[in-house]
Design a protein with these regions (language model features):
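Helix-loop-beta segment of a Rossmann-like dinucleotide-binding subdomain
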Residues: 86-105, 109, 142-144, 241-243
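N-terminal FAD cofactor-binding segment of flavoenzymes
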Residues: 14, 34-83
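Short beta-strand to alpha-helix junction loop
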Residues: 48-49, 95-114, 172, 249-250
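Glycine-rich Rossmann-fold phosphate-binding loop(s) that bind the pyrophosphate
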Residues: 3-9, 27
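FAD/FMN-dependent oxidoreductases across multiple families
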Residues: 102, 246-330, 334-353
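Glycine-rich FAD pyrophosphate-binding loop
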Residues: 16-45, 346
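Predominantly flavin-linked oxidoreductase catalytic cores and closely associated redox partners
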Residues: 118-264
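C-terminal helical "tail/cap" subdomain of flavin- and related membrane-associated enzymes
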Residues: 332-447
Length: 447
């Protein structure tokens, strides 16, 4: 297993059931890590497992949800305890029965890693560089990986029946495959020019009430956004988002002024009297990238790719860790079908599985007129329709739940085009939904 972050850990837990030995190789000191690691620069920022991600994580690692709950990891109902706002209008609060896991990336990763560490057939190779894949050209097979201690020393070959690349967006597998004669890996990308700036605070007010996060989401009309999440007790983390090259300020005064410019007052009201904890951290995400391994004419046996090494998503949609769990489940299903592992079959199955999340992320980014990309008539229609749906969902808990189940990757995107949903959108847009009447011009308030 190349890489021991979330994607590598979920996949390692799966592989440990079917293989006699699983070795996780990572450039960082990962065992016992309680703070964001150098190899995971996005780890400073607010993270979460979407509703479907929580369900899949529990399926992959039984008991994980209760373990995190016992440790105080923030969790809440997708529609009842997460405060979502679009264009200054809060989605109607609605209990969905679906759990979202939030908070600190290092803490979430640590809980999954502790379960992998306790498996009797797993081993961590820390502070180790991955030099190259080992390839048997005669048989068209990856047979292992060459590694080297980060501090220097001799290279070593780790032989393996299966090598899984979970090294993230900087994966070198496309370069290695091309050098081995398998051709160039094509990719799809959408440039969004996103920047996160994150700070942590100690709150002096009850900003959350019974909620666990406050999420005014960026839109073309209001391109500044934020994710304010409880970290337990009186601590919170807040990630401000800027797109198309805008960078939220890192200085405290500028940071607070940015929150005041958001279309809802909740985040600013929570932070204006809060105590800052440490300095701000910024992270740039230029583009979503989907690597199309399934389109290669030839693939070596003994190789799989998971996580951001396979597909990176605009992080404002919160899909990354959920997709890591999904791909681990695809890997499990491919290994457990009773036949020899087929990379082609795996990559095709993984591509099909991530398609809904990719369509949501790319479609959302293409709603911004400045983002370059092909806008089919369907994409234009869907983005206009979703704008009206979110507007109507301010007054309609059923619409809010339908929308959240889709962005939570529980239901397929087509569910929002069902006749019953479309009728409620029309009523909410042109005639009022009849639910929470009179709230159409209100804005979200803290508490």
């Amino acid at each position: 297993m190349l890489g021991a972050s979330i994607a590598g850990l979920f996949s390692a837990h799966v592989l440990a059931r079917s293989h006699s030995r699983v070795v996780l190789v990572d450039r960082d000191e990962v065992v016992g890590a309680k703070r964001p690691r150098r190899g995971v620069p996005q780890g400073h920022h607010v993270h979460g497992l979407l509703a479907s991600g929580q369900l899949m994580a529990e399926d992959l690692v039984p008991g994980l949800t209760q373990q995190m709950l016992d440790a105080g990891v923030p969790m809440g109902d997708l529609g009842g305890q997460l405060r979502w706002s679009f264009n200054g209008r809060r989605l109607a609060s609605t209990r969905t029965g679906l759990v979202v896991v939030g908070g600190d990336r290092a803490v979430l990763e640590g809980h999954v890693r502790s379960r992998v560490e306790h498996l009797p057939n797993t081993e961590f190779r820390q502070a180790t560089d991955i030099v190259a894949l080992v390839h048997d050209e005669a048989h068209g097979r990856v047979t292992g990986v060459r590694v080297q201690p980060r501090g220097g020393g001799s290279e070593e070959v780790l032989s393996a029946d299966l090598v899984v690349d979970a090294t993230g967006r900087g994966s070198r597998t496309p370069v290695w495959l091309e050098s081995m004669g398998y051709g160039r890996v094509s990719s799809d990308s959408v440039k969004i020019g996103l920047t996160y700036t994150t700070r942590r605070f100690r709150l002096r007010n009850d900003a959350f009430g019974n909620d666990v996060s406050v999420n005014p989401v960026a839109t073309p009309r209001h391109p500044r956004g934020a994710f304010l999440t409880t970290l337990g007790g009186d601590r919170c983390g807040v990630s401000l988002t800027g797109v198309l090259g805008e960078t939220p300020p890192s200085d405290l005064a500028g940071f607070l002024e940015y929150t005041r410019s958001l279309p809802v007052p909740d985040v600013y009201e929570a932070l204006r009297d809060a105590e800052p904890l440490g300095d701000a951290i910024s992270f740039r995400f230029p583009a979503s990238v989907r690597r199309r391994y399934e389109r290669l004419r030839r693939l070596p046996t003994g190789l799989a790719v998971v996580g951001d090494a396979l597909c990176t998503f605009n992080p404002v949609y919160g899909q990354g860790m959920t997709m890591a769990a999904l791909q681990a489940r695809v890997l499990r299903d491919q290994i457990g079908d009773g036949t020899e592992f087929s990379p082609r079959s795996y990559f095709r199955a993984a591509s099909r599985a991530l398609e809904p999340a990719w369509s949501i992320a790319v479609g959302g980014d293409l709603a911004f007129p400045e983002v370059q990309g092909r806008r089919t008539p369907l994409i234009r229609f869907v983005n206009a329709y979703l704008d009206r749906l979110r507007h109507a969902a301010h007054d309609d808990p059923r619409l809010a739940e339908a929308f959240l189940r889709v962005i939570g990757l529980v239901d397929a995107p087509e569910r929002l085009l069902a006749p019953g949903v479309a009728l409620r959108v029309l009523r909410g847009t042109y005639g009022g939904s009849g639910e929470r009447a009179g709230a159409r011009t209100g804005v979200s308030r803290a508490g």
